Amino acid sequence: MNSSLLPPVRDLTAVQARVRQTLDKGVQIDLSTESCKRFLRRRVNQKVGVVILYVDIDGSTKMSMALPPDKFATILHVFSQEMSLITSEYGGYVLKYVGDAIIALFPAEYDSGQASKNAVDCAKDMQRIIKECVNPELIGRGLPQLTVKCRSTTAMCKSCSMARV
């Protein structure tokens, strides 16, 4: 992948410093999906166009078997944090975290082409951040580097209200 074609990330040095701090001290941000829930609640009983981005760590099952649980959990924390931050930078919402994956929504209510572009650009930046910021820090600590798979699709969904039990 030609990184010169990718949109610029504001400050890779700051991203790498945050990754380093997360490896040392744990997650540095709120990883809740509350903003996505608010987005969906405002659209209860409406059909909403979205682009769905699915991002996961390639080979994570083997990695989870080879690493001590605390090391694997730390890698998942870094991955989840950095992918979540990039998602929000591109106007997306994290719908949920599923093991080693993140499912994100990009609203396509007004411009599905722009939503698709945002999701694709987000995926490109995710690849770049993994390659240029996350992997050097992991390798420096004797941990395996990550390869990330990204897939997207466009959908119409209907948000419905679910009563709390």
Regions found by a protein language model. Name each.
Residues M65-A66, N118-A119, V165:
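Surface-exposed beta-strand edges and their flanking turn/coil or helix-capping segments
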Residues Y90-A115, V134-V165:
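Catalytic core of nucleotidyl cyclases, primarily class III adenylyl/guanylyl cyclases
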Residues A73, H77, G113-V120:
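Non-membrane alpha-helical structural segments and their capping/turn regions in soluble enzymes
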Residues M1-Y90:
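Juxtacatalytic helix/coil linker segments
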Residues M126:
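Serine endopeptidase catalytic core focused on the charge-relay Asp
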